[in-house]
Amino acid sequence: MRHILYLAFALFCLTGHAQESAEANTLVANVEGTAAIERSRTLNFTEMGQPNGVRLSGINRFVDLNSGIRLDELVTRANLSLRVLYPQGMRHDQSFVRVYVNNQLSGISQLSVARAGVPHTINIELDPLLFSDFATVRIEYDGTYDSECVDPGNPTLRLDMRPESTLTIGSTPLNLVNDLALLPAPFFDPRDN
């Protein structure tokens, strides 16, 4: 009787192992069989809550922009394209724009003296690994006009970002596991913009 129980238990374990390996092979075949299609989404400042653009200064040094990433997407690339204008009177060798994604530094751009007073575009590549379901992109202005003492209220310290500035996010779809706890995803995702 004991031998029959051992045999039944061994067969039960083997069938479970065979089912798991068959499912794993099916998932791998599905992943390898389909090419990952990258989806690109571009949001301008108006769509991210800044319809009039943003003016950063020595007092108001940063702005937060929010974007949602769907549960069934993986961010593969991100680019911030800022349409900016800043005055000529500041020290451009000591003035920067820093970009944080979810409170992690992702990019820095020094302000150019050659482009001061002229509207132009600053492109900053962002680290896609820093993006999560709700992503906060913080743009911080660090400007100075004097190497010794700086008055943060000085009108020379300003950076104007136009509303046509954009955040472009490239993503690939992810296969979600069959779990009712994820509902209403993927049919409805509150992070859709």
Predicted regions and their residues:
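Extracellular/secretory-pathway and virion-surface proteins
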Residues: A18-N193
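Sec-dependent signal peptide recognition
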Residues: R2-L7
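Hydrophobic h-region of N-terminal signal peptides that target proteins for export
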Residues: F9-H17
